[in-house]
Each structure stands twice: as structure tokens, then as C-alpha cells.
Curated annotation (Swiss-Prot):
Other known facts: Circulating B cells able to spontaneously generate specific antibodies directed against Culp1 are detected during active tuberculosis and in some latent-tuberculosis cases.
Protein name per Swiss-Prot or TrEMBL: Carboxylesterase Culp1
Keyword Ribonucleoprotein: no
Gene Ontology terms describing biological process: lipid catabolic process; medium-chain fatty acid catabolic process; monoacylglycerol catabolic process; short-chain fatty acid catabolic process
């Protein structure tokens, strides 16, 4: 078996585990309401059903409970989330970037929160690096879960350096990686990659974002 074949097989195992363990999103609107106080843009993980995915749903639910009576619009990034990692993430970046910039243009007083899980974290990384610098002033917080950053993830990417969060966003980002998660560490526990809701990390990230919304300029 060649190394490329091995990477492909293990990648399918990871994606299948995500699809089986992660609950599909339900009932969440795909597009943010015009000029809500807060706009959340979230990208789901590989092979999760269209919508926010379970991590995104839990993050938004927790954030909603922490921001008082402020209105929250939610946008689920529209992209394949397929195992054609590089092309799929690039497609997601295009969709996320376009939506974020439309929000900034139409609703300049809306505070934006970005989030992504697994491949979705790469989508947000690519988006923040591609958008005009002025957009960063409208983004209050970024929450990343299981961001692909391991050697294994690099192989799935096709080699070379993996995307990282844009420099203008790094100080407003919480980047959470479960212990032994093979996607964001050198670990070997695939189940760790689907533990972000149960571990309480989505609530941790929501608290970070809520504090940023309350205190950041």
C-alpha cells in the first residue's frame, strides 16, 4: 500500500466517524437576518450535513444564552465540506468571504463572530487571510475547533503548509484542540475529534466570544 493510499483510507475513516457521531443541524436558519446586533458565520466540518453541524449549533446556542437580549443572525457557510479538502475549503472560503463582506457593507454596526470546526476552521482561516484589512474591524471574535494543523492534516491537504488565521484576527481568536485529536495534534484518538460539544469547549468558546462582544472595540 502506498503512503498516498494510506492517507486516503485514514481520511475516509475520520470523515465517516464525523458523519456517524456528529448530529445533523436542525432548525437553524441558513442566512442572517438583516442588521442583527450580532452576526455569526460558521463553517461545519467534513461530511456534516448542510447547516451549522453539531459543534456550530452548540456554539450558537451557548452564545445566545450569554448575550442578553441582543439579536443574533446566523449564517451557515454554504460549501461541499467534502474530502476533496483543498478544493472544498477554498469553495467555502469564497462563500464565507462574500457573505462577511456583504454584511459589513449592508450592516456596518453589526458585530460579527466567525467560527469553524475541522475543515470549517480551515475555511475561516482562508477567509480571514483573503478579505480586505478593514473587514477585521467589524469582527469581534473568532472561534476555531479542531483546526487542521497536524502532519496528518497536512497530508490530507496535499502537502505543504496548512492555512492559519489571518494576522489581523489572531488576537481575537480562540483556537481549541481536544487532547489527542489527530487533526490538530499528533494524537491518534479519532473520537477526540468529535468531542468538542461533550467536552464543554463550545461553551468555553462562546464565553470568549461574548466577552469580546461586551468589551472589545
Amino acid at each position: 500500500m502506498t503512503p498516498r493510499s494510506l492517507v486516503r483510507i485514514v481520511g475516509v475513516v475520520v470523515a465517516t466517524t464525523l458523519a456517524l457521531v456528529s448530529a445533523p443541524a436542525g432548525g437553524r436558519a441558513a442566512h442572517a437576518d438583516p442588521c442583527s446586533d450580532i452576526a455569526v458565520v460558521f463553517a461545519r466540518g467534513t461530511h456534516q450535513a448542510s447547516g451549522l453541524g453539531d459543534v456550530g449549533e452548540a456554539f450558537v446556542d451557548s452564545l445566545t444564552s450569554q448575550v442578553g437580549g441582543r439579536s443574533i443572525g446566523v449564517y451557515a457557510v454554504n460549501y461541499p465540506a467534502s474530502d476533496d479538502y483543498r478544493a472544498s475549503a477554498s469553495n467555502g472560503s469564497d462563500d464565507a468571504s462574500a457573505h462577511i463582506q456583504r454584511t459589513v457593507a449592508s450592516c456596518p454596526n453589526t458585530r460579527i463572530v466567525l467560527g469553524g470546526y475541522s475543515q470549517g476552521a480551515t475555511v475561516i482561516d482562508l477567509s480571514t487571510s483573503a478579505m480586505p484589512p478593514a473587514v477585521a474591524d467589524h469582527v469581534a471574535a473568532v472561534a476555531l475547533f479542531g483546526e487542521p494543523s497536524s502532519g496528518f492534516s497536512s497530508m490530507l491537504w496535499g502537502g505543504g503548509s496548512l492555512p492559519t488565521i489571518g494576522p489581523l484576527y489572531s488576537s481575537k481568536t480562540i483556537n481549541l484542540c481536544a487532547p489527542d485529536d489527530p487533526i490538530c495534534t499528533g494524537g491518534g484518538n479519532i473520537m477526540a475529534h468529535v468531542s468538542y460539544v461533550q467536552s464543554g469547549m463550545t461553551s468555553q468558546a462562546a464565553t470568549f466570544a461574548a466577552n469580546r462582544l461586551d468589551h472589545a472595540g
